[in-house]
Amino acid sequence: MKVFVAGPRAVSVLNKQVKGRLSNIINNNFTVLVGDANGVDKQVQKFLHSLNYRNVKVYATNGRARNNIGQWEVEKVEVEPSKKGFDYYAAKDIEMAKNADYGFMIWNGQSRGTLNNIINLAKLNKKVLVYFIPDKQFYTIKDVNNIKMMINTDNTPVSAKFHEFMHNSEQLKLF
């Protein structure tokens, strides 16, 4: 089983609950697909490396990994030179979503990239375990309706971001 693990660059600490779920992945010897960004990607890499876990693939745009703490295999994701910014780095997320069997996302309710990963995995009919930082809860996402339930209409800023994103996402149009 291959698990795509990701989250925002703004999150620089993994709590006990998240580390516990990562430990479950390790105990099952699942392959971890992780990006090379700072934030959650880097913290996940540090945690996996601290446990000498080797069943990891780091996805990097054009093969240039910004972070590869465990010197794991790098999956090179070719990106057209015309792509810039969000779209440039998001290309590797799309590949991880396609290649994964399951997703594990740590989301702060603000990261556009993490929300996009959750949506893309759901649209690919892949389950996603989301640790939703605002609620300090785990949610299992099977489809877009589950995302709506997770963000709850009471959380107006998060809900507004979700609805805006669903209507304006360039990355979603790549499928």
Give the positions of each predicted feature.
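Short, hydrophobic/glycine-enriched beta-strand segments
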Residues: 1-9, 34-35
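A charged, well-structured terminal subsegment
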Residues: 154-175
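Acidic/glycine-enriched connector segments
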Residues: 11-155, 166
